[in-house]
């Protein structure tokens, strides 16, 4: 058989053919054979091309030919058309009886071939898409099973772990290799389990059990023991005002709640086990209800559940009434009492064999004196569970063994559909953090679903953002932490030394006691910070190998969104923000590379963040070598990144930029880094938009400018000017003169920033004083505590006065809001309003009522929401709460719009995040939504709602509004930057 040649038809060539029959096979011959064939055939020579170019496609000619002759026919550039194909076939086949005819590449044949190829490719692509979809569903189902197991079997797994450790200890003596905390918990587990089991089996009267240990037998003793130990240790790690202790009422209620939640799941599983066990042969699956089948499958294998929604409905329909805080506290107290009786620690010191070991209780129940009321002889006491210093030391070193509830989810959260419908698959999830305010709960529950739809969508959008752990940053953090911390903002892992007394002088002893108190307080704060860091790192370690995870969000009562997981989240510290990144990567693009550089400069801060964009870009270009060195050698190089205000986020940006700069095509490098766009003193931005004041709008970047306006620097300059003026006055006539001299050259942006930031949220004089005092302490230029206090008082007054001068319109709006709240609260009514997105808000400030209950441990005084409003709190809290509800609305509106535009979005109140390549689009959206929000008659609607709700009351008139045009916000490059 001859070889194949190629042919490219002339543009002018045309084919006219007859439809050819099927079932013909053709072969290709060489040019020489074709020439011989043409000479021996009856075909004219001009009918054949001068140069033979044969395609791969083969065509049949005639289905009634007996013999086979092969003839190759092609077009030539000088040939206009071929002779009729039937004539060719007849002529050839009469001369050569054993040959066939082969037809070469007409356009319609090529079209058929390409069309067939295209159809085939589409089929292959479709199959691939189907396989990808099948794989996606398979992986989702696997992750969903893991998530359900994590939510429902956590305590069960901990119990099994303790049992396994006990077996290994007996067989292999593994105790010396266990972490310290694990040793403690393992040592407490069996005695506590036995004590609980004994309590469960005790022949006590129903009345006695109801009074002191209700529901003590509602869970297996081993599971209850694990819950008590871990909840108490978790509370101790969270830290608080007290050193090495936690209040009994707090611990008891928390433990009672944890037991109740586990009881619901446990009872549900036990019930389905009994259903399965007592099924007779006659009771086939067909006879069972759909619900029973689901229950049985769930018990048989939690991992294989696929009907989570139906199961939750069944659980909810069969749930008993909530225990209530009284019952929770009673049970919690009894379990705490059993723990204090059975848990012991032994100091790790060498002791002689003939000396009994120094074993002492790990926990003690003691009473402490509350702050005495002046002029009253009654001393108030409260009970605490105090832990031994050895327990604190162990907790300080490691918390890897602690079980943390509400960890980030492996699958997207359930969409919100109601007050308690959404978030985690099985763990109790509530739309709003009401902190026990029944009025707020009732308000949210009573609102139609349609009215809340925008809020639900926003929370779903925030919860659908997929995150992952930045392993390179985590590795750097772990290295620093293992080395003792104390750099890059990490807390020092060593306590400050307690000063020793070297004199018997009364004054020296007094000073020594004060220094000891101060050192202990510092160490207490360090301990709390170390526990917090360990909690964050423990979650990061657990999630570092996951492809991605999600944060279910809910709201505070004002409508601000928060992740439900409290430790490792993007609302937290620089440590958390540096460790977290988007799971999805997107190419930087030209604009993304620019924004990455701007982002890096802003994170470095030190005043760089207040420069124009071009200056920030120039800063990065001038430090390229430092950036590359930081990325390549973060701990052993020149460590430039450590000088940044947000060091870990800065390092993450250095690494991302380094990857781009090393690439031959920087714009195509994928980036997972969230790029921030932050509001400029966002509370004042909202007040400026409400009041339409042009001067205030310019001060907070609602108006376009060549560089960002810095309101903090502006206030600092005003404060410095006032202080310098006071410093030249006569101290005999003006007592502030000496304080002013003391503060010269100490006033800067940092000194006043927090006070300015919180002024719009209703900061009081006392609050401002404490904020400024902390900044002055950090400077360390005033040693005397009394002098530091008086200087802080003076600086706070001056700062608030400067604020009042610059933001008069904002003060007017704040005053109007406060006056309206006072009118309402004077009628013993809480202030209520509805946010622009339809969320009802009720201020939860009521005088509390004390409710005393007797427990086995002590008498507890539980506080409940009363019926009398706190007038002062209702008035002072309303302005900041109202503005918070507005900034929450702006963030949620932006989140939904970004989702609709295909952007990944994360929000931190007044800081919006997305991929570098999408920053320009997000900037446009957030400005449009701000203008849309404040184009609504917000204050007018608020006043109308007050008048409709309280027609008998008289409210002050609306504050005057300025002439600022909101449209200018759309053109302001530094509104968010």
Swiss-Prot record:
The active site is at 678, 753, 910. GO terms for biological process: mitochondrial transcription. Pfam families: RNA_pol, RPOL_N. Transmembrane segments: none annotated. It comes from the Eukaryota. Gene3D superfamilies: 1.10.287.260, 1.10.287.280, 5' to 3' exonuclease, C-terminal subdomain (1.10.150.20), DNA-directed RNA polymerase, N-terminal domain (1.10.1320.10). PROSITE patterns: RNA_POL_PHAGE_1 (PS00900), RNA_POL_PHAGE_2 (PS00489). Its main location: plastid. GO terms for cellular component: chloroplast; mitochondrial DNA-directed RNA polymerase complex; plastid. The keyword Chaperone does not apply. It catalyses: RNA(n) + a ribonucleoside 5'-triphosphate = RNA(n+1) + diphosphate. GO terms for molecular function: DNA binding; DNA-directed RNA polymerase activity. The highest levels of expression are detected in the mature leaves. It is found in: Plastid, Chloroplast. Residues 1-72 form a transit peptide. PANTHER family: DNA-DIRECTED RNA POLYMERASE 3, CHLOROPLASTIC, DNA-DIRECTED RNA POLYMERASE, MITOCHONDRIAL. DNA-dependent RNA polymerase catalyzes the transcription of DNA into RNA using the four ribonucleoside triphosphates as substrates. Belongs to the phage and mitochondrial RNA polymerase family. This is DNA-directed RNA polymerase 3, chloroplastic. It comes from Nicotiana sylvestris (Wood tobacco). The gene is RPOT3.
């Amino acid at each position: 058989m001859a070889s194949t040649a190629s042919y490219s038809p002339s543009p002018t060539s045309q084919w006219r053919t007859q439809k050819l029959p099927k079932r013909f096979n053709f072969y290709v011959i060489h040019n020489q054979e074709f020439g011989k064939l043409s000479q021996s055939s009856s075909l004219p020579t001009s009918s054949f091309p001068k140069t033979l170019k044969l395609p791969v496609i083969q065509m049949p000619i005639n289905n009634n030919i007996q013999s086979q002759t092969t003839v190759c026919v092609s077009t030539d550039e000088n040939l206009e058309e071929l002779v009729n194909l039937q004539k060719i076939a007849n002529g050839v086949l009469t001369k050569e009886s054993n040959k066939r005819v082969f037809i070469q590449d007409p356009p319609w044949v090529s079209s058929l071939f390409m069309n067939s190829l295209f159809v085939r490719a589409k089929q292959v692509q479709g199959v691939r898409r189907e396989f990808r979809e099948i794989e996606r569903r398979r992986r989702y189902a696997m992750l969903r099973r893991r998530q359900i197991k994590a939510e429902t079997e956590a305590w069960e797994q901990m119990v099994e772990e303790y049992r396994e450790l006990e077996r290994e200890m007996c067989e292999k003596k593994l105790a010396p290799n266990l972490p310290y905390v694990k040793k403690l918990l393992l040592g407490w587990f069996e005695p506590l389990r036995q004590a609980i089991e004994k309590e469960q089996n005790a022949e006590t009267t129903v009345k006695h059990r109801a009074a002191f240990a209700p529901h003590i037998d509602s869970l297996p003793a081993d599971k209850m023991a694990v819950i008590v130990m871990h909840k108490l240790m978790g509370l101790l790690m969270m830290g608080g005002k007290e050193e090495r202790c936690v209040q009994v009422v707090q611990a008891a209620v928390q433990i009672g709640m944890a037991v109740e939640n586990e009881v619901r799941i446990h009872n549900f599983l036990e019930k389905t086990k009994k259903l399965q066990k007592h099924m007779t042969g006659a009771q086939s699956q067909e006879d069972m209800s759909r619900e029973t089948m689901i229950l049985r499958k769930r018990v048989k294998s939690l991992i294989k559940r696929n009907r989570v929604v139906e199961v939750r409905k069944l659980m909810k329909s069969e749930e008993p009434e909530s225990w209530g805080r009284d019952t929770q506290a009673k049970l919690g107290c009894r379990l705490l009492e059993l723990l204090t009786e059975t848990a012991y620690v032994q100091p790790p010191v060498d002791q002689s064999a003939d000396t009994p070991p120094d074993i002492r209780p790990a926990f003690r129940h003691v009473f402490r004196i509350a702050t005495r009321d002046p002029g009253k002889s009654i001393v108030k006491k409260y009970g605490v569970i105090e832990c031994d210093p050895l327990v604190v030391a162990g907790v300080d070193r490691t918390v890897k063994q602690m079980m943390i509830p509400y960890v980030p989810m492996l699958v997207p959260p359930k969409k919100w559909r109601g007050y308690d419908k959404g978030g985690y698959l099985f763990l109790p999830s509530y739309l709003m953090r009401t902190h026990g305010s029944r009025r707020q709960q009732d308000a949210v529950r009573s609102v139609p679903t349609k009215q809340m739809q925008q809020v639900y969508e926003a929370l779903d959008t925030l919860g659908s953002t997929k995150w992952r752990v930045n392993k390179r940053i985590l590795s750097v953090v772990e290295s620093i932490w293992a080395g003792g911390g104390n750099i890059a903002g990490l807390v020092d892992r060593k306590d400050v030394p307690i000063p020793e007394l070297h004199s018997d002088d009364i004054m020296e002893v007094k000073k020594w006691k004060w220094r000891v108190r101060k050192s202990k307080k510092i160490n207490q704060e360090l301990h709390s910070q170390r526990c917090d860091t360990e909690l964050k790192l423990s979650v990061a370690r657990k999630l570092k190998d996951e492809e991605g995870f999600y944060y279910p969000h809910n709201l505070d009562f004002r409508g601000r969104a928060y992740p439900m997981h409290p430790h490792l989240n993007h609302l937290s510290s620089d440590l958390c923000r540096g460790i977290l990144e988007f799971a999805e990567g997107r190419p930087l693009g030209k604009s993304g590379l620019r924004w990455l550089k701007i982002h890096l400069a802003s994170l470095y801060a030190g005043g760089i963040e207040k420069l124009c964009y071009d200056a920030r870009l120039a800063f990065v270009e001038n430090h390229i070598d430092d950036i590359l060195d930081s990325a390549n050698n973060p701990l052993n190089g020149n460590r430039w990144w450590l000088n940044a205000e947000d060091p870990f986020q800065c390092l993450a940006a250095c690494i991302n930029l380094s990857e781009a700069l090393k690439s031959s095509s920087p714009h195509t490098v994928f980036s997972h880094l969230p790029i921030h766009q932050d509001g400029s003193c966002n509370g004042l931005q909202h007040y400026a938009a409400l009041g339409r004041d042009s001067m205030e709008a310019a001060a907070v970047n609602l108006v376009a400018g060549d560089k960002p306006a810095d309101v903090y620097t502006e206030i600092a300059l005003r404060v410095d000017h006032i202080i310098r003026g006071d410093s030249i006055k006569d101290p005999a006539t003006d007592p502030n003169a000496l304080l002013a001299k003391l503060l010269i050259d100490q006033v800067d942006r940092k000194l006043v920033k927090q006070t300015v930031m919180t002024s719009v949220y209703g900061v009081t004089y006392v609050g401002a004083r404490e904020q400024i005092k902390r900044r002055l302490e950090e400077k360390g230029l005033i040693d005397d505590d009394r002098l530091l206090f008086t200087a802080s008082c003076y600086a706070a007054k001056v700062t608030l006065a400067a604020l009042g001068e610059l933001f008069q319109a904002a003060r007017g709006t704040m005053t109007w809001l406060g006056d309206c709240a006072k009118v309402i609260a004077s009628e013993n009514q809480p202030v209520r309003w509805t946010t622009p997105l339809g969320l009802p808000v009720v201020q939860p400030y009521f005088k509390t009522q004390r409710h005393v209950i007797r427990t086995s441990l002590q008498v507890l005084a539980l506080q409940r929401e009363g019926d009398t409003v706190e007038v002062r709190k209702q008035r002072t809290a309303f302005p900041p709460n109202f503005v918070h509800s507005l900034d929450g609305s702006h963030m949620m509106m932006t989140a939904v719009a970004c989702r609709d535009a295909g952007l990944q979005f994360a929000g931190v109140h007044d800081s919006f995040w997305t991929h570098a390549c999408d920053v320009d689009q997000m900037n446009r959206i957030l400005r449009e939504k701000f203008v849309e929000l404040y184009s609504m008659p917000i204050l007018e609607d608020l006043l109308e709602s007050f008048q409709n709700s309280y027609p008998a009351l008289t409210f002050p008139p609306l504050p005057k509004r300025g002439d600022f045009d909101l449209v200018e916000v759309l053109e302001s490059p530094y509104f968010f930057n």
